[in-house]
């Protein structure tokens, strides 16, 4: 089937609505919407929930941008895209909870198509979700990865292990020699066997995110915490900032294409701290995190 960008766009708009409704149901606070237009073509809807009952900040962004030429970040990766017009659309979200025992989560689903007269379109889907705990709970990690595995199974036995490994490899801070979190799923350049199959998988990922995340939020949101845990959460949020600004392809693509900076940087935590040569106390829960986030098979 020929790629249907309109169908994808409608799914993404509905997905943004659904996820915002689900997060509001857990938190009680409402999202504020900011609709925007991109001068070079396209626009989007940025939605932010701030200082809620559970979430310090949650951002759920829909964007649909188009242009006559590809940016350097994309043509370096895919030289066959040079000289083509493009459309890129997606939903991207990051949730930063108040409680340090509730992990930060990120999800993204996206579609890209590049066309020129007289040639077949070049298109692909991408996306996934990943979890960044500050304090590790095995039952949470197992639930997260089991949900990811189960949504992948209808698409093939090898899908979950392949996209889990890709996620582990992608969300890695080379300059720190550590994972960003415990991973999940990550896929890019997905265009086989055909459009319908790939679109169905992207829909499963988009819908599976809240199935994976919200039970963990419910389990941890009322746990008591103090200044020690909060300080550690703010320190570890620094890793999130470092990854997004140094390594994340999506952030670089957005900034290089003249994307909307406020929306691109909506993933940043509202508060964060760095501390020179921080070393957690031996045997402390904080010290245990470095071992917990090492790559392993959770299911």
Curated annotation (Swiss-Prot):
Q: Which family would the database say this protein is a member of?
A: Belongs to the aerobic coproporphyrinogen-III oxidase family.
Q: How does it assemble?
A: Homodimer.
State one Pfam family annotation: Coprogen_oxidas
Record protein name field: Oxygen-dependent coproporphyrinogen-III oxidase
Task: List, alphabetically, the InterPro entries matched.
Answer: Coprogen_oxidase_aer, Coprogen_oxidase_aer_sf
Its annotated pathway? Porphyrin-containing compound metabolism; protoporphyrin-IX biosynthesis; protoporphyrinogen-IX from coproporphyrinogen-III (O2 route): step 1/1
Site feature (Important for dimerization) residues:
175
Q: EC number(s) of the enzyme?
A: 1.3.3.3
Task: Look up the coiled coil feature and give its residue ranges.
Answer: none
> Biological process GO terms, please?
protoporphyrinogen IX biosynthetic process
Q: What does this protein do?
A: Involved in the heme biosynthesis. Catalyzes the aerobic oxidative decarboxylation of propionate groups of rings A and B of coproporphyrinogen-III to yield the vinyl groups in protoporphyrinogen-IX.
Q: Where does Mn(2+) bind?
A: 96, 106, 145, 175
Which species is listed as the source?
Escherichia coli (strain 55989 / EAEC)
Q: Which Gene3D superfamilies match?
A: Coproporphyrinogen III oxidase, aerobic
The UniProt annotation places substrate binding at 92, 108-110, 258-260
Q: Which ranges does the record mark as transmembrane? A: none
Q: Which UniProt keywords apply?
A: Cytoplasm, Heme biosynthesis, Manganese, Metal-binding, Oxidoreductase, Porphyrin biosynthesis
Subcellular location field: Cytoplasm
Name the catalysed reactions: coproporphyrinogen III + O2 + 2 H(+) = protoporphyrinogen IX + 2 CO2 + 2 H2O
Q: Where is this region: Important for dimerization?
A: 240-275
Tell me the cofactors it needs: Mn(2+)
Q: Identify one Gene Ontology CC term for this UniProt entry.
A: cytoplasm
User: Could you name the active-site residues?
Assistant: 106 (proton donor)
User: Looking at the keywords, is Chaperone present?
Assistant: no
């Amino acid at each position: 089937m020929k790629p249907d960008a309109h169908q994808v766009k409608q799914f993404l708009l509905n997905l943004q609505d659904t996820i915002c409704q689900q997060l509001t149901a857990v938190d009680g606070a409402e999202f504020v919407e900011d609709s925007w237009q991109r001068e070079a073509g396209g626009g989007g809807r940025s939605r932010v929930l701030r200082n809620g009952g559970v979430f310090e900040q949650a951002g759920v962004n829909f964007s649909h941008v188009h242009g006559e030429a590809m940016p350097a970040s994309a043509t370096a990766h895919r030289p066959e895209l040079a000289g083509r017009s493009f459309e890129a659309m997606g939903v991207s979200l990051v949730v930063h909870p108040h409680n340090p025992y509730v992990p930060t989560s990120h999800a993204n689903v996206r579609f890209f198509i590049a066309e020129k007269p007289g040639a077949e379109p070049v298109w692909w889907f991408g996306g996934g979700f990943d979890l960044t705990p500050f304090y590790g709970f095995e039952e949470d990690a197992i639930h997260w990865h089991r949900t990811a595995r189960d949504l992948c199974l209808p698409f093939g036995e090898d899908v979950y292990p392949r996209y889990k490994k890709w996620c582990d490899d992608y969300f890695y801070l080379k300059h720190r020699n550590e994972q960003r979190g415990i991973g999940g799923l990550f896929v890019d350049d997905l265009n086989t066997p055909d459009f319908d199959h790939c679109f169905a998988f992207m829909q499963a990922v988009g819908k599976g995110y809240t199935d994976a995340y919200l039970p963990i939020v419910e389990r941890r949101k009322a746990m008591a915490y103090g200044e020690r845990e909060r300080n550690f959460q703010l320190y570890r949020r620094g890793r999130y900032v470092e990854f997004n600004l140094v390594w994340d392809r999506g952030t670089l693509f957005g900034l290089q294409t003249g994307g909307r900076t406020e929306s691109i940087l909506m993933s940043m935590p509202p508060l964060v701290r760095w501390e020179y040569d921080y070393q957690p106390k031996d045997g402390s829960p904080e010290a245990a995190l470095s071992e917990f986030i090492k790559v392993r098979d959770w299911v």
